[in-house]
Design a protein with these regions (language model features):
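Conserved N-terminal segment of class I S-adenosyl-L-methionine
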Residues: 1-68, 72, 81-87, 105-110, ...
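Residues lining the SAM
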Residues: 72-75, 95
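Catalytic P-loop NTPase motifs of RecA-like helicase/translocase cores
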Residues: 78
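Conserved beta-strand signature within the Rossmann-like core of class I S-adenosyl-L-methionine
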Residues: 89-101
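Conserved active-site loop/cleft motifs that coordinate metal ions or position small ligands
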Residues: 93-95, 139-142
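Short alpha-helix
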Residues: 118-134
Length: 175
């Protein structure tokens, strides 16, 4: 999955990022793959996981600029997501459960509905609208993670992945 995610970012940007911050890095598998080709790799997590070799843990997502910031299955867990407007980066990659919300009954029975855990629910349009308000424009979108995770009987996309570019340009030693 980590290679697929990194390939999507590189393909969407048409280049290898100079630095990357993975928010909610967990076991560090994505950062470990990134560290093979990205010079500066950083992780932010609410839990105290060890950072993979060659990667650094940071205590804030908004203090310094990064080329790319990723939220793989993590953005929907934050109580207040307005901090996204304060991110200093050229691009953001977000992967979230794809909420189709066809009816109250559908939503009530949705497998990703976890009221105490998933605090935000997005479909493509709602995620794009939110990110535009935060200062980002859609670069690419896909359901690429479904190629690995998807149940063959499932009719609709399960995981939504989008790459956004910032309206602003950040320059620093990290980006």
């Amino acid at each position: 999955m980590a290679h697929l995610r990194l390939g999507n970012i590189i393909g969407s940007l048409s280049r290898v990022p100079k630095s990357i911050l993975d928010v909610g890095y967990g076991d560090g598998s994505f950062l470990k793959v990134c560290s093979n080709i990205i010079p500066k790799c950083y992780g932010y997590d609410v839990s105290s996981y060890p950072a993979p070799d060659g990667c650094e843990i940071v205590s804030s997502m908004t203090d310094q600029p990064y080329d790319v910031i990723t939220f793989f299955d993590s953005l929907e867990h934050f109580e207040d997501i307005e901090f996204v407007k304060d991110l200093k980066c050229t691009a953001v990659c977000i992967s979230v459960p794809h909420c189709h919300n066809k009816s109250d009954e559908w939503f009530e029975n949705w497998k990703h509905r976890r009221p105490d855990e998933h605090l935000w629910h997005f479909d493509k349009d709602s995620l794009v609208n939110f990110m535009e308000r935060m200062g980002f424009v859609l670069c690419s979108h896909s359901n690429l993670e479904d190629t690995i995770r998807k149940n063959p009987d499932q009719e609709e996309p399960n995981i939504l992945t989008c790459v956004f570019r910032s309206f602003k340009r950040y320059e620093s030693s990290n980006s």
